Amino acid sequence: LGARGIACGPEAVLITDGAQQAFDLIARAFVEPGDAVAVEQPGWFGAALAFRAAGADLLGVRVDDEGLRVADLERLLRVRRPKLVVATPAVQMPTGVALSDARREALLALADREQLPVVEDDFDGELRLAGPARPALKTLDRGEQVLYVGTFSKALFPGLRLGYLVAAPALV
């Protein structure tokens, strides 16, 4: 976590059986049947499956060459408020784009203002072809709105399901 710039104690970390279990636990804790969850469109189907299994209505938010379109998410909030937002800011799945710095700031400002939890899927945050990795959203999170999901299964141990969730200690 230190390599991603996340400073936290063990009371803020929950070890899971892969990232998918972390999504499942978040869905069970936050979502009631009929609640809305904002997801990237296109986005990773695994996260969508976990929230759909909890009874969530999935609300797609478009992704472009700068990542999640935060302005679209803000407009969506006026129509139907999601319980949380799921985003992959480092390496968006399936497009591979990274959320721009301006949109990272805008997303966190919106989350703080609206008290809207953001699930950060950092499945491959250390992957880069050139230059340093962008910091995880969780490193910029002042209002404890970000639930950070990571995994070792993709990069280190494909056959071993090992993930983790970093959140405010009260949630863990």
Please report, for each region that a protein language model flagged, where it lies by residue.
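Conserved core segment of the aminotransferase class I/II
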Residues: T139-V172
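Conserved core of the PLP fold type I
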Residues: L1-Q115, E126-G143
